[in-house]
Design a protein with these regions (language model features):
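Short, small-residue-biased leader/transition segments that mark boundaries at the very start
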Residues: 2-10
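Soluble periplasmic/extracytoplasmic beta-strand elements of cell-envelope proteins
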Residues: 17-19, 102
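Phosphate/oxyanion-binding active-site loops and adjacent basic polyanion-contact surfaces
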Residues: 4, 23-24, 149-153
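Gly/Ala-rich beta-loop-alpha elbow adjacent to hydrolase catalytic centers
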Residues: 19-28
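Helical cap/lid subdomain of alpha/beta-hydrolase-fold lipid enzymes
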Residues: 32-164
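Gly/Ser-rich "nucleophile elbow"/oxyanion-hole loop immediately N-terminal to the catalytic nucleophile
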Residues: 9-17
Length: 164
């Protein structure tokens, strides 16, 4: 819950890792839009996005017939994605390692979020991130609700965050 995040830097919390699933990713992104340049707050060093609906949710607000260019830029952007473009002005340059995990059950998405919507994160932050990597989880483990309940996600997430 981002509402319980510290509002000022304390000696106990100087560095921060964030992990979001589904709409939790929007909380991370809007936190960075609103506070990404605030040096009084803990420094974000690692960000994990799981099943991020950056350019919409299937059947709700995802544009039809979206294509991504090589940089992850969607050919059509929904209203939320256009607001997320502001993160390009506030995201700390060469500071944050980013891991983007998404699912594909065989139909181009995880049942709630398309691969294209999840992969559109690349356009938002890969140019300023310290590193950016993507992992696709295929098959039944790639279902939206399963993505936070499988070792196919847990293992690379733990290795990314803690090097274990």
């Amino acid at each position: 819950d981002l509402h319980s995040f510290p509002t000022r830097r304390s000696s106990d919390l100087n560095l921060l890792n964030m992990v979001g699933h589904s709409y939790g990713n929007m909380s991370i992104m809007f936190y960075m839009i609103n506070h990404g340049t605030d040096t009084t707050l803990p420094k974000l060093v690692k960000q994990v996005n799981i099943a991020g609906a950056f350019n919409g949710v299937i059947g709700i607000d995802e544009p039809d017939d979206v294509r991504l260019d090589d940089n992850g830029k969607p050919s059509i952007m929904n209203e939320t994605y256009r607001a997320l473009l502001n993160v390009q002005e506030t995201y700390p340059e060469n500071q944050v390692d980013v891991l983007n995990i998404y699912g594909d059950t065989g139909n181009g998405g995880d049942g709630s979020v398309t691969v294209k919507s999840a992969k559109s994160l690349r356009y938002l932050i890969s140019d300023v991130a310290k590193s950016y990597q993507e992992i696709e989880i295929d098959g039944s483990d790639g279902r939206h609700s399963k993505l936070h309940e499988t070792s196919k996600v847990d293992d690379p997430l733990i290795k990314f965050l803690w090097g274990k």
